[in-house]
């Protein structure tokens, strides 16, 4: 019997019904009653089956809860045991401390008999009496200074107190105002000082930038001078080779004129080296070239010549060195050491060439004396170039 089928009605029969009703009707009522009983039994069985499963689940849950509660109980019992043990330990410690803190009669007697403790108690007693006396005196003074609102002394004292309070407030304002003014003045000074520092820093930055530009210019000038010096040395080496090839016992004036032309070329290169990257006028280059024609030449050791010409050259070079060697060395070295800019190098070289032209004699333009002069002048030129290179290296 399913839950969807309606439950049959319960049949109720009394004793009168049994007596009055017919047999067929009684059988029908009995069948209805049996159907009702069967429906109830089916429902009961269904309920019993559901209740059994639910009871089993609930039983398992209860068992788990019982186990969990038993475990918790054990844990709590252990905690309780530990707490009780701790409490016992605490009680024992408390009893021990009480016993320690409660001195015995013997200890009390020993403390009372101790002279140091007796002295300490006597001092405490004296100080207590002094404080009591001071307290009484202060109370008496306080009671003497008490006054009523109508007393003149109280009014005067209150007025004096108000006046003192006002004076204190005014003094505080003055002090605060003076401090603020001082701080403002210091702040203005600091601002002015910071502005001056800023301006000086800007000037220094501009000066440093200018110095960097000048250093770059000097470096480019030095590079050009080094290149020109290298070219000049190469030309001097070529000139020495030509001189060594051309110097022979059968030399004539024609062969001596060729070195003069080569010396002019060398002097032009030297003047260009001294002038640096600046493009000077042709007249200045000619002037400096004539000056270097008398000075710039190769060293004396690189000139192989005959004995006669060598003696003449050595005599003329000694005479030239004795008369104006110092005048050659100082102007030339000074001229090369003063190469700070293209304009300065051009002016110094022009001045040096004018001095050298004015110091020469017309008789020194001879072939033999010219060779000696070129020898000495080449030494001076090399010394001046080396000194100028050293000076520029120190500048870098």
From Swiss-Prot:
The modification Phosphothreonine is found at residue 350. Disruption phenotype: Death at E6.5 due to defects in cell proliferation. Residues 240-257, 278-291, 305-316 have a biased composition (Low complexity). Residues 240-396 are annotated as: Disordered. It comes from the Eukaryota. Residues 340-351, 380-396 have a biased composition (Polar residues). This is Pre-mRNA-splicing regulator WTAP. It comes from Mus musculus (Mouse).
């Amino acid at each position: 019997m399913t839950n969807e089928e309606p439950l049959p009605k319960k049949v109720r029969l009394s004793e009168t019904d049994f007596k009055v009703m017919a047999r067929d009707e009684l059988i029908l009522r009995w069948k209805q009653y049996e159907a009702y009983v069967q429906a109830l039994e089916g429902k009961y069985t269904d309920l019993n089956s559901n209740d059994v499963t639910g009871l089993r689940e609930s039983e398992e849950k209860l068992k788990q809860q019982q186990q969990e509660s038993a475990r918790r109980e054990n844990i709590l019992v252990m905690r309780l045991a530990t707490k009780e043990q701790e409490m016992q330990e605490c009680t024992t410690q408390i009893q021990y401390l009480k016993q320690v803190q409660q001195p015995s009669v013997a200890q009390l007697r020993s403390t009372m008999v101790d002279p140091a403790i007796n002295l300490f108690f006597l001092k405490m007693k004296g100080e207590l009496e002094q404080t009591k006396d001071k307290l009484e005196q202060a109370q008496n003074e306080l009671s003497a200074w008490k006054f009523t609102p109508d007393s003149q002394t109280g009014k005067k004292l209150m007025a004096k107190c108000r006046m003192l309070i006002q004076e204190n407030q005014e003094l505080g304002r003055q002090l605060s105002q003076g401090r603020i003014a001082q701080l403002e003045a210091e702040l203005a000074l600091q601002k002015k000082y910071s502005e001056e520092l800023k301006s000086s820093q800007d000037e220094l930055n501009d000066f440093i930038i200018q110095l960097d530009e000048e250093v770059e210019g000097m470096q480019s000038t030095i590079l050009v001078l080094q290149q020109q010096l290298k070219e000049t040395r190469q030309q001097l080496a070529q000139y020495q080779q030509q001189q060594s090839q051309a110097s022979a016992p059968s030399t004539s004036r024609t062969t001596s004129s060729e070195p003069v032309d080569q010396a002019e070329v060398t002097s032009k290169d030297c003047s260009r080296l001294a002038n640096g990257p600046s493009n000077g006028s042709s007249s200045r280059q000619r002037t400096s070239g004539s000056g270097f024609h008398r000075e710039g030449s190769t060293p004396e050791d690189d000139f192989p010549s005959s004995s006669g010409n060598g003696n003449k050259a050595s005599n003329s070079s000694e005479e030239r060195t004795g008369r104006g060697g110092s005048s050659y060395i100082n102007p030339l070295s000074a001229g090369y050491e003063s190469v700070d800019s293209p304009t300065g190098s051009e002016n110094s070289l022009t001045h040096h060439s004018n001095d050298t032209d004015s110091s020469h004699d017309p008789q020194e333009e001879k072939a033999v004396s010219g060779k000696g002069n070129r020898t000495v002048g080449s030494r001076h030129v090399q010394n001046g170039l080396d000194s100028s290179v050293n000076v520029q290296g120190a500048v870098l």
